[in-house]
Amino acid sequence: MICPVIELAQQLIKRPSLSPSDAGCQEIMIQRLAAIGFTIEPMNFGDTLNFWAWRGEGETLAFAGHTDVVPTGDESHWHSPPFEPTIRDGMLYGRGAADMKGSLAAMIVAAERFVAAHPDHKGRLAFMITSDEEAKAINGTVKVVEALMARHERLDYCLVGEPSSTDRVGDIVKNGRRGSITANLRIHGVQGHVAYPHLADNPVHRAMPALNELVATQWDEGNAFFPATSMQIANLQAGTGSNNVIPGEFYVQFNFRFSTELTDSLIKQRVAALLDRHQLDYTLEWVLSGQPFLTAKGALVDAVVNAVKHYTEITPQLLTTGGTSDGRFIALMGAQVVELGPVNATIHKVNECVSAADLQLLSRMYQKIMEQLIA
């Protein structure tokens, strides 16, 4: 008999839910949750499907995740078709197996087992699911959180099923994430002929000292939970493509991954002061993708660590490394937020896969977390 976690994961992987498409994944989950007494509230925005589901009342533990996946790349490089889930040598292959349809299956089956064992559980169990995490992430969790906050919805704990693990399930737990802010800088000059530089003003030449200082700056030293803030230049663009034209404008895009030692407003102030010191003629636009968040300690961290230790006998590392996740939006509700999911070695890659045994373990861990917090 096939494991219910693996069976559900396969059903979800079969759905080609390229972001922001859901391709029917949420309907599968909704039917399973409704069957065990959950109230389902669709919260769709634009081209994105979301739902908020809950059972019980009181102190609230939510499980959050996304049904959308990234593109497959060249399918001829896959050992088996990416939307035909295949088990080989104990590994479940398919796009989304690790990020994050395996986690979704583990959550649903954990909820079914938990409700069967604790039909009158004392707290509230909830699900916050979106199809817009991998792409723009503008009509997904952020909009759901805004709607829930507007009506003063309670959220005490949130477990995000992102693939947090490195070598074995549960070895890494994310108890926070760095903030992310991007600068789109345009430095203005005067276009001209390269043979007559005195009649032009080359913005690339003007910008170089400022960019050198930008790169050399140590923005902070981090703290006990976060590494030092990182600034990386991502894109540069200037010129017409001709070798005899001095460009009239120089575009530079750079990104900060910042710790709780900095704020987005402080970053903006320091960058503007640096550019002004170099007397540049510029325009600057900022895009804030997310604030840093941290759950340093608390009942959720304790429950997650205990669940991992119970099933693996390893003590997970609590880290804040990696990119952003939807946890950055959920933390705005004042909830304790922790990420626990499968091994992330193959996410977004050709031949994405996850250990079938790990998914079974993960589901038991999720159930154990439920039992500790709201049984």
From Swiss-Prot:
Zn(2+) 2 binds at D99, E134, H348. Its cofactor is Zn(2+); Co(2+). Pathway: Amino-acid biosynthesis; L-lysine biosynthesis via DAP pathway; LL-2,6-diaminopimelate from (S)-tetrahydrodipicolinate (succinylase route): step 3/3. Zn(2+) 1 binds at H66, D99, E162. The active site is at D68, E133 (proton acceptor). CDD domains: M20_DapE_proteobac (cd03891). Homodimer. Belongs to the peptidase M20A family. DapE subfamily. PROSITE patterns: ARGE_DAPE_CPG2_1. The lineage of its organism: Bacteria, Pseudomonadati, Pseudomonadota, Gammaproteobacteria, Enterobacterales. Binds 2 Zn(2+) or Co(2+) ions per subunit. Signal peptide: none annotated. Pfam families: M20_dimer, Peptidase_M20. PANTHER family: ACETYLORNITHINE DEACETYLASE, N-ACETYL-L-CITRULLINE DEACETYLASE. It is an enzyme of class 3 (hydrolase). One of its GO terms (molecular function) is zinc ion binding. The keyword Cytoplasm does not apply. It comes from Yersinia pseudotuberculosis serotype O:1b (strain IP 31758). One of its GO terms (biological process) is diaminopimelate biosynthetic process. Catalyzes the hydrolysis of N-succinyl-L,L-diaminopimelic acid (SDAP), forming succinate and LL-2,6-diaminopimelate (DAP), an intermediate involved in the bacterial biosynthesis of lysine and meso-diaminopimelic acid, an essential component of bacterial cell walls. This is Succinyl-diaminopimelate desuccinylase. Keywords: Amino-acid biosynthesis, Cobalt, Diaminopimelate biosynthesis, Hydrolase, Lysine biosynthesis, Metal-binding, Zinc. Its EC number is 3.5.1.18. It catalyses: N-succinyl-(2S,6S)-2,6-diaminopimelate + H2O = (2S,6S)-2,6-diaminopimelate + succinate.
